């Protein structure tokens, strides 16, 4: 029986301008012009040409900047839509708490795409909702993610740490080009591993991940297939601080309604001040904005009626969220918000298949990753996300027309029933984390 090597992917999460030189205008040897005439006759057109060239370069540069800005905005928008689609798939299998990172999943799958060709590459792009980004620029997607990673890492107030590992079996021949591109775009650290000794490999990889996530994910891997050749791991650690922290003195145990019949007691935080919010009449939901330091925001979506939160998921899109944000009004309000901690782990392989990414196992074409790429398969796509929300902030690892009405908001919003939350980086519009809380006391 032939053993097919398996590729295991786990998700935790220069531009050169070449301008031709201008050749000097030739002068006729038969009729040499006096020096002062040469200056007037030849130099003036050259100055005009140089001015035209500079104007052309400036215009091209402006067009390139505008195009890159539009591409970054489209990347953020489509990654959010991918996240909402993935939420719907997860929700079909899980009726409880949900939390994951659309950004982390897109980052890892784009990293895998560096080694993919043919139908495998096409399906990954479509599954991530990124097929519309300029297909004539093959390095565009990883370049955009690289720029986004660098922007996020420079924001020290944000408290976001992102990294990537490639655990490679010691005898497995990975193409140097793939490793170089992974390092260039995703700063991937390559670590040799002996997967034949599965228990030792599991222990070492868990040690690496535990260290990089600062103890938040001490045990990512429960078991390792000894036939594994390569494991790609992306991790994201978010330690956000509220722009206006909740005062722990006012945190009290209160009632949280899981559904019409079941209630639980939870630590309920309290804050008073100016908060941005809106009310969507179509969906009968309150949308509350809780800002972090570093230009990051948590949006909390709270349905008026118990049990309607599942129906809302069918209509979540970037356009709907943008409509909410445009109609936000800032008012003096009281906010009651539960403390919670979630720790969720998803085998995303089947979920991604349902979203059209089928040619990663079997029949994957990873020939840009290895010379044996047509005999490889992605055996697992794993994401584990941990998020904790308290008085100080958040610590996390990993088209329908909506009618918005202006009305007198209630003096208080009390989040005492199931709700959705989204954590955005506002400058880029990137959706970092997305989740649903049904029971704040359960991981």
UniProtKB/Swiss-Prot annotation:
Annotated site residue numbers, Reactive bond: 407-408
Any GO BP: blood coagulation
InterPro entries membership: PZI_serpin_dom, Serpin_dom, Serpin_fam, Serpin_sf, Serpin_sf_1, Serpin_sf_2
Region spans: Disordered: 24-66
Location in or out of the cell: Secreted
Signal peptide feature range: 1-23
UniProt keyword annotations, A-Z: Blood coagulation, Glycoprotein, Hemostasis, Heparin-binding, Phosphoprotein, Protease inhibitor, Secreted, Serine protease inhibitor, Signal
Post-translational modifications: Phosphorylated by FAM20C in the extracellular medium.
Pfam families recorded: Serpin
Main location: secreted
Purpose of the protein: Inhibits activity of the coagulation protease factor Xa in the presence of PROZ, calcium and phospholipids. Also inhibits factor XIa in the absence of cofactors.
Family: Belongs to the serpin family.
Protein's name in the database: Protein Z-dependent protease inhibitor
Gene that encodes it: SERPINA10
């Amino acid at each position: 029986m032939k053993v097919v090597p398996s590729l295991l992917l786990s998700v935790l999460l220069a531009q050169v301008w070449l301008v031709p030189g201008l050749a000097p205008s030739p002068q006729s040897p038969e009729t040499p012009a006096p020096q002062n005439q040469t200056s007037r006759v030849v130099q003036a057109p050259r100055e005009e040409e140089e001015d035209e060239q500079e104007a052309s370069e400036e215009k091209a540069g402006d067009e390139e900047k505008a195009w890159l800005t539009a591409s970054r905005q489209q990347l953020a928008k489509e990654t959010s839509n991918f996240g909402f689609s993935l939420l719907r798939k997860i929700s079909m299998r899980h009726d409880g708490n949900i939390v994951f990172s659309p950004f982390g999943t897109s980052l890892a799958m784009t990293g895998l795409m560096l080694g993919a060709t043919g139908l495998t590459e096409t399906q990954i792009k479509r599954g991530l909702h990124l097929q519309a980004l300029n297909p004539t620029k093959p390095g565009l997607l990883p370049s955009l993610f690289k720029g986004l990673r660098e922007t996020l890492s420079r924001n020290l107030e944000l408290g976001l740490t992102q990294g990537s590992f490639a655990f490679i079996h010691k005898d497995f021949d990975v193409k140097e080009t793939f490793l170089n591109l992974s390092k260039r775009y995703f700063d991937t650290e390559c670590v040799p591993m002996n997967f034949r000794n599965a228990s030792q490999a599991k222990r070492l990889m868990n040690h690496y991940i535990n260290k990089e996530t600062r103890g938040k994910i001490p045990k990512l891997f429960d078991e390792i297939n000894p036939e594994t050749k390569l494991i790609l791991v992306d991790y994201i650690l978010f330690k956000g601080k509220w722009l206006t922290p909740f005062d722990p003195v006012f945190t009290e145990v209160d009632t949280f309604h899981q559904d019409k019949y079941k209630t639980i007691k939870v630590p309920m935080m309290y804050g008073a001040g100016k908060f941005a919010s809106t009310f969507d009449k179509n969906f009968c939901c309150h949308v509350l904005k809780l800002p972090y330091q570093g230009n990051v925001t948590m949006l909390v979506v709270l349905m008026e009626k118990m049990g309607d939160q599942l129906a809302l998921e069918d209509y979540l899109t970037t356009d709907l969220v943008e409509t909410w944000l445009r109609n936000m009004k800032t008012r003096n309000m009281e906010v009651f918000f539960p403390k919670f901690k979630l720790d969720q782990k998803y085998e995303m392989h089947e979920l991604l298949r349902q979203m059209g990414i089928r040619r990663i196992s079997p029949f994957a074409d990873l020939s840009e990753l290895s010379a044996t790429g047509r005999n490889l398969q992605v055996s697992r796509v794993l994401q584990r996300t941990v998020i904790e929300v308290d008085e100080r902030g958040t610590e996390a690892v990993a088209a329908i027309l909506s009618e918005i009405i202006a009305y007198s908001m209630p003096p208080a919003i009390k989040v005492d029933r199931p709700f959705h939350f989204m954590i955005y980086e506002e400058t880029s519009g990137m959706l970092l984390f997305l989740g649903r809380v049904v029971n704040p006391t359960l991981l």
